[in-house]
Design a protein with these regions (language model features):
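Interdomain "pre-motor" coupling segment immediately N-terminal to P-loop NTPase/helicase cores
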Residues: 23-77
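N-terminal pre-Walker A segment at the start of P-loop NTPase domains
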Residues: 80-102
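Active-site signature of alpha/beta-hydrolase-fold catalytic machinery across serine-
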Residues: 105, 129, 133
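Walker A/P-loop nucleotide-binding motif
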Residues: 110-126
Length: 256
């Protein structure tokens, strides 16, 4: 009785390959430039059409998978879709013209945005909604409360991997820092936060949400010079959205 020869790795695929064989091969093929480059020489028009359709669907599938992953990777504390955001409590600068934050044009230009106003006026809600829009448009986002990146950067510094942590933050196209000024930050933590902000200057957008006017940012950074430098960068390459009105939580409180 003759024995079946074992299938050799890298052997020629039969002309009448089964769908299972095709899928088995495709699973192990992160394609290089050299292989697809030879396809027009070896394939018939029908085969090229099939491959184009296959690759188009694969690209669409990967893009959709990435779109679903991005919100989880961003670290949003909760979901705040844009449709639930009115923006009615924020006043926009007069020079904005018809541009609104949801267009994300400021992200395309690597500009910064400061959301300033009293507690409970919707700053965090708007910041998350903008971040979720960015994720839908395939822009990587990182969301932090102000104390969180300080702790991460300090631990990274202690572990001699500060550069790696800064690069990790730097992979985002939009960084959101919430509650800036809610809790005091010591001078070393402020320097680390400033370094992360300096690395982002004109290379990615940063949204900062704070209830402190710029004149009190020295309280955040613990150093007037660092505060002045941070404000200078924002004035040069950013905008301020002012929030006003009664706190949403107070307005809808059950304790009345």
């Amino acid at each position: 009785m003759s024995q079946q020869k074992p299938r050799q790795r890298g052997g020629r695929v039969p002309d009448k390959a089964t769908p299972e064989q095709v899928m088995g091969l495709a699973r192990n093929l992160p394609l290089t430039h050299s292989v697809p480059g030879k396809a027009p020489e070896d394939a018939t028009p029908g085969q090229l059409g099939f491959l184009a359709n296959l690759f188009e669907k694969e690209n669409a599938s990967r893009a959709e998978s990435k779109r679903r992953r991005l919100p989880g990777q961003a670290g949003f504390p909760q979901s705040r879709p844009w449709r639930d955001t009115t923006g009615g409590m924020a006043s926009f600068p007069a020079d904005r013209g018809s541009e609104q934050p949801e267009s994300l044009e400021f992200v395309d230009r690597d500009e910064d945005l400061v959301l300033y106003g009293d507690v409970g006026c919707g700053k965090t809600h708007l910041a998350i909604a903008i971040g979720m829009l960015a994720c839908q448009r395939m822009i990587p986002v990182r969301f932090f409360t102000a104390s969180s990146p300080v702790m991460r950067l300090r631990k990274a510094q202690d572990d001699n991997r500060l550069d790696a942590e800064l690069k990790s933050i730097g992979r985002a196209g939009l960084v959101i820092i919430d509650e800036l000024g809610h809790l005091p930050i010591d001078i070393d933590g402020a320097r680390l936060l400033f370094q992360a902000g300096a690395d982002s200057y004109e290379t990615r957008s940063v949204i900062s949400a704070s209830n402190l006017e710029s004149g009190r940012w020295g309280d955040v950074f613990g150093d007037g010079d660092m505060a002045a430098a941070a404000i200078d960068r924002i004035v040069h390459h950013g905008r301020i959205l002012r929030f006003h009105g009664e706190s949403y939580r107070n307005k809808h409180s059950l304790m009345k």
